[in-house]
UniProtKB/Swiss-Prot annotation:
The modification Phosphoserine is found at residue 296. The lineage of its organism: Eukaryota, Viridiplantae, Streptophyta, Embryophyta, Tracheophyta. Residues 72-135, 425-484 are annotated as: Disordered. One of its GO terms (cellular component) is plasma membrane. This is Probable receptor-like protein kinase At5g18500.
Amino acid sequence: MGSGLNDTLSRNYNGLELWEIIVIVLSAIFVVVLAISLWLTFRRKTSRSSSNLIPVSRQIPPSVPEEIKEIRVDEVSSSNGGNGYPSISEKFGDKEPEKGIKAESENGDSSRSGSFNHLEKKDGSSVSSANPLTAPSPLSGLPEFSHLGWGHWFTLRDLQMATNQFSRDNIIGDGGYGVVYRGNLVNGTPVAVKKLLNNLGQADKDFRVEVEAIGHVRHKNLVRLLGYCMEGTQRMLVYEYVNNGNLEQWLRGDNQNHEYLTWEARVKILIGTAKALAYLHEAIEPKVVHRDIKSSNILIDDKFNSKISDFGLAKLLGADKSFITTRVMGTFGYVAPEYANSGLLNEKSDVYSFGVVLLEAITGRYPVDYARPPPEVHLVEWLKMMVQQRRSEEVVDPNLETKPSTSALKRTLLTALRCVDPMSEKRPRMSQVARMLESEEYPIAREDRRRRRSQNGTTRDSDPPRNSTDTDKSEYHDLKPEGG
């Protein structure tokens, strides 16, 4: 039997004996199995080492819609091509861009809002230069690895160091959304760190809303989002720090020196706020409806420039779009009636809220104050009543040392009353509001005057000459709110 097995194994197949073929096949199988084992082992080690190199904080950030682009406030209309968006000159008047950019240059802040330099010629004219002005970035000196295209990526440790371990002494604001801390980055830049509360995933939602609303926009009157932190369940937003309180504090004398704003400072702050809202509503796509415009959300820097903050309730809307919700958000006293009653939201909701802020700045009163007599509880209704009774001079904030001129008061009152018109379609756009506040004339369109004359059956030629008393009466008549 043994000799038979030997004979079988010794048989010749293509020049090789059978036992040689068996050894070769077994060796090949062994080599293949060994190679596969080594490859799998190497792959496991590689995946482990790579996972150890990436900390928890390096998660993939939430995606930001590509349609939200960085758009400068003073971009010329030629950049719009034929897309149908109004140019800046259409929105703010033919001379406004030059005036705005020159003023910004004088303040040393033009790099933050203008894409073109305006150079003065000897003959007084100006030309545009396509080279943008640049200023040092508040993020200069920080590691570049955390730049992901839509803000700076901070680690939890970065922000712990910046805020002294989120010390209570660093708290500058809190609410249902979370807590805001003052901090200093490693390069010395002061920041405001908004730490969102993570209630049932609400932090993720609030984080996404604010990033989508303001992450890629730039305007000198919008508080700038510098970056964010995503680490574990932590969601934080890092904003520029605005160091001079907010409009509400300055209207109530709640600032450090218990001082009140002058009339000129109030108008400057209101114009800046109006231009920022016009930018959000009319210059970017999708437009941004803030939904919580109020005096405490208008921050003030050391040069008394306004900066709109807190975009936690903001809503993105396409062109000519409205949004209907069953959950009305905002602050009582500032919410537009159509939004409060039916949930209909569009940019005219912000216009109404801005009108209430205007009335606050004029009167120094709260939008709703139950400590006052019943006719004076609601600011909007009380002011309409005072205007109808031709007692406009009596509504001015008594804390103003120097009262505004009669024409300035009338102009601002009329602008405010148009903003708080109960019919949203009659409210002006924010670009119109900015023009009204800057104009030296009453914001009564010539077409409106002509229409009123035609309805009364009179013409310009047939109008009798009026003395100053008649003029004053007519102007007070113009102040009467429509539908109020």
